[in-house]
């Protein structure tokens, strides 16, 4: 009988909290040569969720890659969360995912049952998304890791980016925040299992359903809120769109338990990186609780979509989303460029 392995004990970082900080990443990519191609509509120079390559007048290829170390101990659940997180980038571009390849790192003494369970979890969520996993690559490493390289398709004039927000747009978020803080708390055994079951369910929810609804409306920009936190991804959207985002802090959904855990200091390292990256571009119109501010910088794993939609369509889109995703909320609005990229109201 194989020994049960606690996956999170094998990893220093968990989920999207392992992501290299946005500021560090920008420095690493500075000076790296890029090849221009008139068919490459979105490349890594845009800091977007995926690349977009025009195949013909009706079809563009959308590609992304995402993998990370375990955020939960259950191997099948880890596979599900990692797959949902990877596929999400395709949805954030308004595209339809179709094909994927496994990316996997395993320790030399990792039980076969655990490895197979991770793969089963990935296949399960890929199937729900309508994605075919056609193969992959596995190597030995000191820590287990899993994710997917995903390809999808979209009309070359209908894809979304994180740099298309316009003044007057309304911002909608489809999942509550606090995942990084709560998973950090769970690793330290500070949080009730019932609370974590709710968080694990959220991380396994595909953004497919939000994507299928939002493409019916006049959406100008979209990104998924993951490793850089709400303010990090908001900062990228504001910078890329040359606008200022006003976040209404009282309207931002988050798990209440994350507030008390943040007060106890259960802050993942990624939150500090995100704060260092984005804080200079953030202005606080009113005093904000430090724990709530930590939640706004908290790295999310398999987070929701942040959608910039025209004011005329915002109410109808929100109602449509809430029929399937009750936690979707309007969290802010877009204005012309001001001194700061983000205003917290």
Please provide the spans of the model-predicted regions.
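Active-site glycine-rich loop that binds ribose-phosphate moieties when present
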Residues: 149-158, 194-214, 288-290
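Short, compositionally biased
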Residues: 183-199, 324-327
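Small-aliphatic-rich amphipathic alpha-helix that forms the alpha element of a beta-alpha
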Residues: 75-101, 117-128, 206-217, 225-237
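N-terminal glycine-rich phosphate/pyrophosphate-binding loops that anchor nucleotide-derived ligands
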Residues: 1-92, 131, 166-172, 176, ...
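Glycine-rich anion-binding loops of enzyme active sites
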Residues: 57-61, 66-72, 96-191, 333
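A generic local secondary-structure boundary/capping motif
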Residues: 40-42, 50-53, 89-91, 123, ...
């Amino acid at each position: 009988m194989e020994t049960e392995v606690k996956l999170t004990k094998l990893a220093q970082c968990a989920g999207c909290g392992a992501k290299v900080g946005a500021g560090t990443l920008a420095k690493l990519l500075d000076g790296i040569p890029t090849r221009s191609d008139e068919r490459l509509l979105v490349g890594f120079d845009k800091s977007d969720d995926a690349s977009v390559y025009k195949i013909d007048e009706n079809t563009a290829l959308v590609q992304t890659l995402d993998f990370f170390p375990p955020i939960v101990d259950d191997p099948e659940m880890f596979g599900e969360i990692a797959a949902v997180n990877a596929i999400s980038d395709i949805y954030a571009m308004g595209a339809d995912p179709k094909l994927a390849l496994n990316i996997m790192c395993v320790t030399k003494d990792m039980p076969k049952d655990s490895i197979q369970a991770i793969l089963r979890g990935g296949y399960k969520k890929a199937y729900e998304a309508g994605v075919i996993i056609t193969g992959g690559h596995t190597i030995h490493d000191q820590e287990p890791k899993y994710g997917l390289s995903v390809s999808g398709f979209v009309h070359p004039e209908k894809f979304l980016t994180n740099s298309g927000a316009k003044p007057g747009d309304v911002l909608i978020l489809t999942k509550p925040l606090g995942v990084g803080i709560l998973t950090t708390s769970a690793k330290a055994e500070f949080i009730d299992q019932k609370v974590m079951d709710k968080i694990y369910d959220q991380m396994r929810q595909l953004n497919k359903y939000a994507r299928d609804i939002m493409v019916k409306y006049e959406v100008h920009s979209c990104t998924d809120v993951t490793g850089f936190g709400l303010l990090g991804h908001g900062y990228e959207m504001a910078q890329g769109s040359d606008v200022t985002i006003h976040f209404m802090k009282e309207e931002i959904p988050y798990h209440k338990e994350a507030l008390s855990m943040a007060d106890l200091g259960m802050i993942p390292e990624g939150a500090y990186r995100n704060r260092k990256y984005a804080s200079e571009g953030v202005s606080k119109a009113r005093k904000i609780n430090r724990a709530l501010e930590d939640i706004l910088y908290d790295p999310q794993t398999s987070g929701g979509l942040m959608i910039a939609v025209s004011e005329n369509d915002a109410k109808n889109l929100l109602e449509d989303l809430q029929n399937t995703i009750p936690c979707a909320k309007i969290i802010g609005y877009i204005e012309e460029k001001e001194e700061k990229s983000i205003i917290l109201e």
